[in-house]
Amino acid sequence: MLLSDRDIRAEITAGRLGVDPFDDSLVQPSSVDVRLDNLFRVFNNTRYTHIDPAQRQDDLTSLVEPKEGEPFVLHPGEFVLGATLERCTLPDDLAGRLEGKSSLGRLGLLTHSTAGFIDPGFSGHITLELSNVANLPITLWPGMKIGQLCLLRLTSPAEHPYGSSSVGSKYQGQRGPTPSRSYQNFVKND
């Protein structure tokens, strides 16, 4: 069941759902708008011949922070990682779905490639997978509305929420745009 604005406010007031910093004006009829943080991860495409999800490639991306009052310019065809300004904390009976803002989609900005789902129990800044599919550069301003977080109530609390030792949560507590840790999904045969 998708939470309404009144349910979202009630969950935040009760301290079960965390959206920090919280601004009540960002609550929409069935979502909470989230804003763009000021940190980005750009790909160093001259260091590798290819991306291998099975390999740890620590210098595949570099952290970039635009100067105060300046935007990050995302060029056509580019892909970077960003993050929400808000730290989001979900209880064990709520899951989240990050959606883009339609006004930005109409300009050619995609806010996530595949990872729009947030598990119950997650706590951290949500990493954004930003792509420009337009034919002109798009300026991304820290603090701008970048997406909307929809919240869904589970039929029962998760037995092993995200962050539990049994589920191998790789991104719990993340701050800023966090690079892929897909290599942790591969078993090493030494």
From Swiss-Prot:
GO molecular function: dCTP deaminase (dUMP-forming) activity; dCTP deaminase activity; nucleotide binding
Binding site for dCTP: 101-106, 119, 127-129, 148, 162, 174
Bias type Polar residues, positions: 163-190
Keyword tags: Hydrolase, Nucleotide metabolism, Nucleotide-binding
Active site: 129
Coiled-coil annotated residue ranges, if any: none
Record text on subunit structure and interactions: Homotrimer.
Protein's name in the database: dCTP deaminase, dUMP-forming
Originating gene: dcd
